[in-house]
């Protein structure tokens, strides 16, 4: 407290002075360690020491942040909004000035303890920021992102300085330092949050998304350089630092030390430990201790300790398993528990009421709007000179306003050096809040991807000619899904005349730990090091299994892909990838797995929802495989044995059954496959009881007859094919016939049509017992545990442009109605402070069938090619 300030003698423990720099508290530190007569259980108050108070503060901070996060999630706002609101909730203008909060939650005498833990959490959080940033992504081949980034910085810095000076509230002695920190906070762009916004809107793989991310990386790195310069230029009192040359030189030496000594040294040590097979907790503790040591070094150099933590995070080898081990041990605890303390500290420093005493309200609005528009205008003008479309330029400019924890770090750095007083600090905090509120909703509303997905003809197996390549997208969640799908592909008769092109996609759930570098997967930046050990090992094994299938068959090509997405929008990635690769058939695993006793377990409900969504939105035909031991087909049949493998195709009628027949027909070329096609024909009693209109039934029956006739004509001389017709009157007759078939022949695989929305007389009465609508009536019956114990089932739905467009339109209408009503949907939440909720904001494939595009053009989805 400055000399001559009036003392508050009403409280002998501490005195408070209020100035433009906020509340300055002076208290007797010996009171914290005051010896009391009561000992142990005789203590008069359990909250008399700092530890119980800290636990209380930790609980209040986490509870407040969680409540605000859940309240802002339905509005599709980033977690950064909840972070700022959590701090402002306890600001002096809201709850921070109440007697109860001051006395029992955030007393002034324990502020030092709170700030200590908050700063420690910040140091480790910045370390994780550097740990998750892969500098290989800075290898930019185009100059457009670099020009956009530097132009935005060069314009935002002087404009930020002018906006700081415009209200006339800055302290006269701190104008220069205040302009620097205000400008840096305005110019910075938070790369991790920007990447997650693009992931939410399915724009990561768009040209606009790539340009924005590259520009954000350059801006992020330049922000750190400017921040270090700000630390070095000004002393703790906000005036020029006479030791600035020493600070800059020592900091530059430490940077070179990290590049040429620390990084190679850590890489060498970890290479030795991995070779010896010893990577454990000791190495993690070594790294965590190094964070504190590097922070101490940069603090001694004259810059903030977060600089050392960030540089040390960049120094950890990107491809080493230790990165993932550190994130698993540190991320959730840090961002979910300790970081809310930092937000509370930011809020305690902001005083909206105090700011309004010095700031004109109209001028405050002008400054906030100007702060947001400066990057948009700059980016648009720069982009137009580089022939970037206007809509893309506007979207990039809006994304450059993405703020995050780094912006708060800059403001608090200016607050610590007294470069920013309380009104200006509060003013800028509100500006950051407004920018965060506007960016993603504005982008979702104003930017609609102009590119549509490619138009292609072969969207069904039935339309594939005998000498045309069959392109299949095989989806895998976990390793047990692989064996059945690979063996189904093995018996799909890939030949030189009709090759099989397989795109095997490993579906990985997007969680709060997923770093921005994992979201932005490409050929140069491989994301393996960011996976957990289990997922990484599983992904490798899945890729090896599919690649081995390619080695054993010259007529088959395999490309393995890893898709990272939340369950709520995973079907979008599957559909977009299917359209992009021009596949005509998607294979999905059934969500239930076989138990040791031969029955079907409960399964994963999220996987079931994915299957249902894919069936509704798929751009091609879809098959769901219920695997009950398809591995037997490969293990025995491909050793040259003469034993035939029995495949039964159950034909009821309709487009789905015709598609199923086409796929089963393709298998006939395999010398080990024996196909039996059973057509169920409704009897006269069934037609009369069902009340079928003659014209409707005859029209559909005519198409079925033509398909069956063609099949019989072309396979009449094939001894491996058998065709049977069964007359049935209802669903019970159909089930009895299938049971009779099972008793007389042991089938390995059933191929059936889904028969969605079909009301066939031969399945009458079976719909009442259906538990899995995605399998259809016959498929659900065959998949039930009490029907068959060893035969796998492939349920196929044929692509229909009319049905798909209707489903997409209905889904879009539901989304709009849900947004109006405040319905949140099934969006995924994550526990981390940097976690980003996802949303089903738009359908990038609604009118894909009407637009043409180049085959190799990448679309708005995120996936990585496994080499």
From Swiss-Prot:
GO terms for biological process: pollen tube guidance; potassium ion transmembrane transport; proton transmembrane transport. One of its GO terms (molecular function) is antiporter activity. The keyword Nucleus does not apply. The chain crosses the membrane at residues 43-63, 75-95, 112-132, 146-166, 175-195, 212-232, 242-262, 283-303, 336-356, 362-382, 393-413, 427-447. Its main location: plastid. InterPro entries: Cation/H_exchanger_TM (IPR006153), CPA2_transporter (IPR050794), Na+/solute_symporter_sf (IPR038770). Keywords: Antiport, Chloroplast, Endoplasmic reticulum, Ion transport, Membrane, Plastid, Potassium, Potassium transport, Transmembrane, Transmembrane helix, Transport. Pfam families: CHX17_2nd, CHX17_C, Na_H_Exchanger. Belongs to the monovalent cation:proton antiporter 2 (CPA2) transporter (TC 2.A.37) family. CHX (TC 2.A.37.4) subfamily. Operates as a K(+)/H(+) antiporter or Na(+)/H(+) antiporter of the chloroplast envelope that functions in pH homeostasis and chloroplast development. Monovalent cation transporter with a preference for Cs(+), K(+) and Rb(+) relative to Na(+) or Li(+). Required for pollen tube guidance, but not for normal pollen development. May also be involved in the development or function of the female gametophyte. The gene is CHX23. The keyword Transport applies. It is found in: Plastid, Chloroplast membrane; Endoplasmic reticulum membrane. It is a multi-pass membrane protein. This is Cation/H(+) antiporter 23, chloroplastic. GO terms for cellular component: chloroplast membrane; endoplasmic reticulum; endoplasmic reticulum membrane. Residues 851-860 have a biased composition (Acidic residues). Disruption phenotype: Mutants with impaired chloroplast development that display aberrant chloroplast structure. No defect in male fertility, due to redundancy with CHX21. Chx21 and chx23 double mutants are male sterile. Residues 848-867 are annotated as: Disordered. Specifically expressed in flower buds and pollen. Expressed in leaves, roots and stems. It comes from the Eukaryota. Coiled coil: none annotated. It comes from Arabidopsis thaliana.
């Amino acid at each position: 407290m400055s000399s001559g300030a009036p003392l508050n003698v009403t409280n002998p423990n501490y005195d408070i002075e209020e100035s433009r720099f906020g509340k300055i508290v002076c208290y007797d530190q010996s009171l914290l360690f005051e010896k009391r007569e009561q000992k142990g259980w005789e203590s008069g108050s359990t909250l008399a020491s700092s530890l119980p108070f800290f636990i209380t503060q930790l609980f209040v901070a986490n509870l407040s942040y969680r409540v605000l996060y859940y309240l802002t999630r339905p509005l599709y706002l980033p977690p950064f909004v909840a972070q700022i609101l959590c701090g402002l909730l306890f600001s002096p203008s809201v709850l921070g000035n109440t007697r109860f909060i001051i006395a029992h939650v955030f007393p002034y005498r324990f502020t030092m303890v709170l700030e200590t833990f908050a700063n420690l959490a910040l140091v480790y959080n910045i370390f994780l920021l550097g740990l998750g940033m892969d500098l290989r992504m800075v290898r930019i081949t185009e100059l457009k992102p670099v020009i956009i980034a530097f132009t935005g910085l060069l314009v935002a810095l002087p404009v930020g300085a002018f906006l700081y000076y415009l209200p006339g509230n800055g302290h006269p002695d701190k104008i220069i330092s205040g302009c620097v920190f205000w400008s840096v906070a305005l110019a910075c762009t938070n790369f991790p949050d920007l990447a997650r916004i693009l992931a939410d809107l399915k724009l990561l793989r768009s040209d606009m998304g790539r340009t924005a991310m590259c520009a954000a990386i350059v801006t992020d790195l330049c922000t750190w350089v400017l921040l270090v310069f700000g630390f070095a230029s000004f002393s703790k009192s906000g005036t020029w630092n006479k030791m600035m040359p020493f600070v800059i030189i020592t900091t530059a030496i430490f940077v070179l030390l990290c590049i040429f000594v620390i990084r190679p040294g850590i890489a060498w040590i970890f290479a030795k430990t991995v070779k010896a097979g010893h990577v454990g907790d000791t190495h993690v503790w070594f790294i965590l201790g190094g964070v504190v040591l590097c922070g101490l070094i940069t603090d001694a150099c004259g810059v903030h300790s977060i600089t050392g933590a960030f540089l040390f995070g960049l120094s950890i080898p990107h491809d080493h398993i230790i990165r993932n081990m550190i994130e698993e041990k540190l991320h959730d605890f840090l961002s979910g528990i300790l970081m809310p303390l930092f937000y509370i500290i930011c809020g305690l420093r902001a005083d909206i009421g105090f700011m309004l005493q010095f700031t004109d309200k109209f001028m405050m609005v002008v400054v906030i709007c100007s702060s947001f528009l400066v990057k948009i205008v700059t980016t648009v003008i720069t982009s137009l000179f580089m022939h970037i479309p206007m809509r893309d330029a506007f979207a990039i400019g809006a994304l450059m306003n993405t703020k995050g924890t780094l912006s708060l770090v800059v403001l608090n750095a200016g607050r610590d050096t007294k470069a920013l007083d309380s009104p200006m600090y509060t003013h800028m905090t509100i500006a950051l809040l407004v920018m965060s509120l506007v960016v993603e909703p504005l982008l979702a509303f104003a930017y609609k991807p102009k590119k549509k997905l490619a138009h292609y003809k072969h969207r069904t197996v039935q339309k594939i000619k005998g000498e045309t390549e069959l392109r299949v997208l095989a989806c895998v969640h976990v390793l047990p899904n692989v064996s059945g799908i690979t063996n189904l592909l093995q018996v799909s008769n890939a030949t030189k005349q009709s090759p099989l092109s397989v795109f095997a996609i490993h579906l990985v759930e997007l969680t709060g730990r997923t770093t921005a570098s994992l979201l932005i997967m490409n050929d140069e930046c491989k994301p393996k090091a960011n996976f957990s050990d289990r997922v990484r090992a599983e992904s490798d094994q899945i890729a090896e299994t599919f690649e081995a299938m390619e080695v054993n068959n010259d007529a088959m090509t395999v490309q393995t892909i890893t898709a990272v997405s939340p369950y709520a929008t995973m079907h979008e990635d599957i559909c977009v990838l299917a359209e992009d690769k021009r596949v005509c058939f998607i294979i999905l695993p059934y969500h239930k797995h076989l138990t040791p006793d031969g029955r079907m377990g409960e399964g994963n409900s999220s996987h079931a929802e994915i299957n249902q969504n894919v069936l509704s939105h798929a751009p091609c035909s879809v098959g769901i495989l219920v695997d009950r031991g398809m591995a037997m087909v490969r293990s025995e049949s491909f050793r040259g044995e003469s034993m035939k493998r029995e495949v039964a195709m159950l034909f009821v009628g309709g487009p789905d059954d015709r598609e199923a027949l086409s796929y089963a027909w393709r298998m006939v070329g395999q010398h080990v496959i024996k196909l039996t096609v059973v057509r169920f024909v409704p009897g006269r009693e069934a037609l009369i009881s069902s009340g079928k209109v003659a014209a409707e039934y005859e029209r559909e029956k005519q198409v079925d007859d033509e398909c069956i006739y063609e099949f019989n004509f072309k396979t009449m001389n094939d001894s491996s094919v058998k065709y049977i017709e069964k007359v049935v009157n209802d669903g019970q007759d159909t089930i009895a016939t299938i049971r009779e078939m099972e008793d007389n022949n042991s089938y390995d695989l059933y191929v059936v049509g889904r028969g969605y929305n079909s009301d066939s007389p031969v399945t009458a009465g079976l719909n009442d017992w259906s538990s899995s609508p995605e399998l259809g009536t016959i498929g659900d019956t065959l998949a039930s545990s009490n029907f068959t114990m060893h035969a796998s089932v492939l349920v196929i739905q044929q692509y229909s442009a009319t049905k798909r467009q209707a489903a997409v339109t209905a889904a879009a209408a539901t989304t709009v109605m849900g947004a109006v009503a405040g319905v949140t949907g099934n969006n995924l939440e994550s526990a981390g402070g940097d976690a980003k909720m996802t949303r089903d904001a738009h359908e990038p494939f609604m009118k894909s069938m009407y637009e043409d595009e180049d085959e190799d053009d990448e679309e708005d989805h995120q996936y990585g090619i496994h080499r």
